[in-house]
Curated annotation (Swiss-Prot):
Belongs to the YciB family. The gene is yciB. InterPro entries: YciB. The chain crosses the membrane at residues 19-39, 52-72, 76-96, 123-143, 151-171. This is Inner membrane-spanning protein YciB.
Length: 184
């Protein structure tokens, strides 16, 4: 349910943008995001830092988008957020010797992987966020607003799904293999 809850504001934004327009879509996105954060707080007792950061970014850039009736502000939000995600992953690993992917996945799922695997995963996700940033920058500047909204809603979602599947396949190779002994 938690993952589904994260997509509801985006889906509502897409629908309202296609049916009504940018100002109403931005306002819908802001309200849906605030409700989402409230539900997360009530249901899970806390809001993760990443979700809070995204919520603040949505409110800030969404407000600018609604006020000026210009989609450019939300386009920049996506570019800036992905740049920050990539930067945080890289600086935490190479500047502070902390692997955030390991902290997120290793604790929650009790994954025990070799350190080099965690480092590659961290670097891989940083590169993924940089790729998303660059593709978003290109589409937002050179293609139509309608195409950008489609890309933001479905393209990045698809790219993230593919990156997650690749991560799972990569991790699976390093999981301890259990041997089943069915001899009686």
């Amino acid at each position: 349910m938690k993952q589904l809850l994260e997509f509801i504001p985006l889906i509502l934004f897409f629908a309202v943008y296609k049916l009504v327009g940018i100002r109403e879509a931005a306002i819908t996105l802001i309200i849906a995001t605030l409700i989402q954060l409230l539900i997360l707080k009530i249901k899970y007792g806390k809001v993760e830092k990443q979700q809070l950061f995204m919520g603040i970014a949505v409110v800030f850039f969404g407000t600018l988008t609604a006020y000026f009736n210009q989609l450019e502000y939300l386009k920049w939000k996506v570019t800036i957020v992905y740049a920050i995600f990539a930067l945080v992953l890289l600086v935490s690993q190479y500047g502070f010797n902390k692997n955030l992917i390991k902290l997120m996945l290793g604790k929650e799922d009790a994954l025990e992987l070799p350190e080099q695997v965690w480092n590659r995963l961290n670097l891989g996700w940083a590169l993924f966020f940089l790729l998303c940033m660059l593709i978003n920058l290109y589409i937002s500047q050179y293609l139509s607003d309608d195409l950008w909204v489609d890309f933001k809603t479905f393209g990045i979602l698809g790219m993230t799904l593919i990156a997650t599947i690749i991560t799972g396949i990569y991790i699976y190779r390093y999981l301890p293999q259990t041997k089943s002994n069915n001899k009686e």
